[in-house]
Amino acid sequence: MKWLKQLQSLHTKLVIVYVLLIIIGMQIIGLYFTNNLEKELLDNFKKNITQYAKQLEISIEKVYDEKGSVNAQKDIQNLLSEYANRQEIGEIRFIDKDQIIIATTKQSNRSLINQKANDSSVQKALSLGQSNDHLILKDYGGGKDRVWVYNIPVKVDKKVIGNIYIESKINDVYNQLNNINQIFIVGTAISLLITVILGFFIARTITKPITDMRNQTVEMSRGNYTQRVKIYGNDEIGELALAFNNLSKRVQEAQANTESEKRRLDSVITHMSDGIIATDRRGRIRIVNDMALKMLGMAKEDIIGYYMLSVLSLEDEFKLEEIQENNDSFLLDLNEEEGLIARVNFSTIVQETGFVTGYIAVLHDVTEQQQVERERREFVANVSHELRTPLTSMNSYIEALEEGAWKDEELAPQFLSVTREETERMIRLVNDLLQLSKMDNESDQINKEIIDFNMFINKIINRHEMSAKDTTFIRDIPKKTIFTEFDPDKMTQVFDNVITNAMKYSRGDKRVEFHVKQNPLYNRMTIRIKDNGIGIPINKVDKIFDRFYRVDKARTRKMGGTGLGLAISKEIVEAHNGRIWANSVEGQGTSIFITLPCEVIEDGDWDE
């Protein structure tokens, strides 16, 4: 496996890193170049078509001024034919204010003249008096092409008299961009090949001295300190080789002088940053450092000469003979007033003959570590709250399958599909919780999608309704389809948090209400989730979105709350340009309000 060893060498790694840096640099440059080039080409194309359309608009206005709307049709047809001789123009139509097609440049569409245009973009241009554009796919005889549709209303005396509808073939722009990209890729490949060759030789000059030092290290580990590393230059590698040779020489000189005191010095030097207590063979304290005095909260004169086990309050638990046999460490409360906790390690000082000459106790302050451990356990408990809902839902479907639903050819695949979706969402949910700090730094990615909110919220309610048999769910959701743009996984987490809290704190005849209202004027909707629970004191309502805040710690822990769910929900909602707040009356229940951007879509609103 010589080739595998060569692949793992520093020389190969340097070449790989060098090549990767070049690749990354070229990718960044290529991405920047391509994006800007595409934008520039598209902008120029649209600018030319727009100027072309404005010239046609001026010509049509003159025809209307001279001949009026009744006698202008033939002249307009001639104008459109003159302006349609450009290669990128697919078709030009003129549509009057009543959406009637007056003229078209496409021979096959002449049958559409004097018929009503049903295109929503035309209707929008006529009603608003403003130009608009969009992309469509259309077949001009050679397969589907990308077509840029541009509408510009024609006005006479500030009144809209019609609309110019232009279809322009934008595919040539993308073909030109693809050709440029191919040239760039070939150039990158050639540069990469040259980079690999240069990287191999450059890495060789760096790794050769390091390889020599590695070989010398192997010899030193065998006790051979006579060899020296060859110095190739005066750079950092050369200085390192010189320092390595000096080190080898000093180790050789020090080895003979330190062997007899090695065990004692190693024990003391290794633990100097901790509390050190050294005793004689009878257990009386002879040496103690300042850290040990500080940890014990005692003066040196109150310790020297006393029994170590008595000072540590361990005389009832251990004997000196047991220390020699038991090397396990344990925690000890040294200073209850300051809450100081230390991990104590005992070791014995033994001569070569096996005679015990003393004992050493090492006190390591683990107060902060213990506090971190407590916080870690609390964090794990908090995270478990966020995982409970998907696990419960999965359990419900699995139980249904175990009870016989697997035999149903329609239900079984649906149940398995939902179970798989919940498993994947649970994994993403854990990652989101662990990356809460990324949300603070605005580095957490939001993957937005166009969502049918009615279907989205009903699906969530249905899932909770299946797992919570003792809770009544009341829905007040508009029949009109509401579309919004957000990350479905993160917003599912928000609604799961709010609904779970509503069910958890409801009392008696549990009831959770869902009210959705939209405000078309501002393109926003408000979701209200109300429970009949225990409520929140008015002076604490604004604090429930703080991280790890609990209204009643004992009650919240008993019910499994973490104090983290609503804080995460607030971060997610605000990342979607929304807002979340609460209203509550103690003893009567709590309402959580969420506002999000939205758009109500009715029939005919989509572009054809």
Swiss-Prot record:
One of its GO terms (cellular component) is plasma membrane. One of its GO terms (biological process) is osmosensory signaling via phosphorelay pathway. It holds the Pfam family HAMP. Residues 261-331 form the PAS domain. Residues 382-600 form the Histidine kinase domain. Residues 204-256 form the HAMP domain. Keywords: ATP-binding, Cell membrane, Kinase, Membrane, Metal-binding, Nucleotide-binding, Phosphoprotein, Transferase, Transmembrane, Transmembrane helix, Two-component regulatory system, Zinc. It is an enzyme of class 2 (transferase). GO terms for molecular function: ATP binding; metal ion binding; phosphorelay response regulator activity; phosphorelay sensor kinase activity; protein kinase activator activity. It is found in: Cell membrane; Cell septum. It is a multi-pass membrane protein. Residues 314-378 form the PAC domain. Signal peptide: none annotated. CDD domains: HAMP, HATPase, HisKA, PAS. The keyword Zinc applies. Gene3D superfamilies: 1.10.287.130, HAMP domain in histidine kinase, Histidine kinase-like ATPase, C-terminal domain, PAS domain. Autophosphorylated. The modification Phosphohistidine is found at residue 385. NCBIfam families: HK_WalK, sensory_box. Member of the two-component regulatory system WalK/WalR that regulates genes involved in cell wall metabolism, virulence regulation, biofilm production, oxidative stress resistance and antibiotic resistance via direct or indirect regulation of autolysins. Functions as a sensor protein kinase which is autophosphorylated at a histidine residue in the dimerization domain and transfers its phosphate group to the conserved aspartic acid residue in the regulatory domain of WalR. Forms homodimers. Forms homooligomers. Interacts (via N-terminal region including transmembrane domains) with probable virulence factor SpdC/LyrA (via N-terminal region including transmembrane domains). This is Sensor protein kinase WalK. It comes from Staphylococcus aureus (strain NCTC 8325 / PS 47).
